[in-house]
Amino acid sequence: ELKEMIEGLEQFDFICGYEINLSCPNVKHKTIMPFLNKNYIKEIVKNARKLTKKFFSMKLPPYTGIEYAPLCEEYGADAVTLNNTYPGVVYYEDKKFISGGISGPVIKPMMLYNIFQTAKLIKIPIIASGGIQNYKDVEEALNTGAKAVQIGSINFIYPDAIKRILNKEL
């Protein structure tokens, strides 16, 4: 799947890089999660590097990102993204459970911890992801060791969040 995707996208000059998500908790069939297997991560990173000369970052799970970031660096990733959402479950009164990813400001302290610890272990850039809501959050992530940030959940509240953050309006 990765090979098909990268080969299909390589033809477009306007694509300057990729983020390879190794930990999305929002998938239907969760029989095996690849982030639990170091060999799988090693093979994905090595294969991605063989397929492209473009920049690529490995988006790592929050609970093993510190451990696997050096492996991503060793096998050719240009950066790591920390972190993805945390898996969670919501219970409804009709006794239905819905699982998915927990994101937003609640995960920011854990994301900052992971960046702080990982920055001691690797030289490649860390992209912060998780709970960035305003300019202060961006500063915290950068001061903790990130070189860039991703903006996600806040876009549901403010579709122009990036502009507002850049202008220090958030």
Question: Where do the PLM segments sit?
Answer:
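Active-site beta->alpha loop and helix N-cap motifs at the rims of alpha/beta catalytic domains
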Residues: E1-M33
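Aromatic/hydrophobic pocket-lining residues that form the small-molecule binding cavity
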Residues: L2, I41, V45, G65, ...
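Glycine-rich phosphate-binding active-site loops on the catalytic face of alpha/beta enzymes
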Residues: L22-C24, A79-V90, G131-I132, D137-I165
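Catalytic cores of alpha/beta
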Residues: L2-G8, Y63-Y75, Q117-K123, A128, ...
